[in-house]
């Protein structure tokens, strides 16, 4: 497998870190098989559970992955239609890591694929292409780190990565809580996750350089076009939960705080 493919699998494990979300089904000289489990709220309000299986050949991403779709809520025809659309999307992004973007595309477009209503019913809203998702939208991701043993070096590394990738946001410290809030385009946030998961950014208990193994993605969402966004990346320390909450509220992210941060205290 290519180094970029192995890095992508590591990044997928970091992004889909909840129990059962991401699983490497097999790994051999012939390639890697990865399963992503996700859910999409249907138009009736009920959740559609999906299992997306990607067989990554040794030549991936120079060769396309083999894709299969499993869901008890979808008919056989709907599963085939979704698979065919994913293959079409994958062909547009040959030579580059694509699995996470294909999952996001599925989450964004599944209901339109199932229902296929008239354009007038959709009021002009059509399925988003991967290009639209990755290049024309701003994403917000919230990460949690367990600890930083080599804090000064770690912070400088994060600052360098965000600067190189033109990401804005905050590295936030409150007691033992460490959060990284990032805003930027899809490719840059994805590239950051790959760096965060695959580079030696800290030291272990013996002082030896090590990769980040205790990171979780708390939230990942598209920022509404009219919502204000961060213009810089800053490292900040807070003295109270109230101060941290005000930071989120000032950025228009109070919902993210209440749904993903408040429960950490």
Curated annotation (Swiss-Prot):
Q: Which Pfam families match?
A: RWD
The UniProt entry, under SMART domains, shows: RWD
Q: Which residues form the RWD domain?
A: 7-114
Q: Does the keyword tRNA processing apply?
A: no
What the entry says about domains is: The RWD domain is required for the sumoylation enhancement activity.
Q: What does this protein do?
A: Enhancer of SUMO conjugation. Increases SUMO conjugation to proteins by promoting the: binding of E1 and E2 enzymes, thioester linkage between SUMO and ube2i/ubc9 and transfer of SUMO to specific target proteins which include hif1a, pias, nfkbia, nr3c1 and top1. Has no effect on ubiquitination.
> What is the protein's given name?
RWD domain-containing protein 3
Tell me the organism: Xenopus tropicalis (Western clawed frog)
At the highest ranks, the source species' classification is: Eukaryota, Metazoa, Chordata, Craniata, Vertebrata
Gene that produces this protein: rwdd3
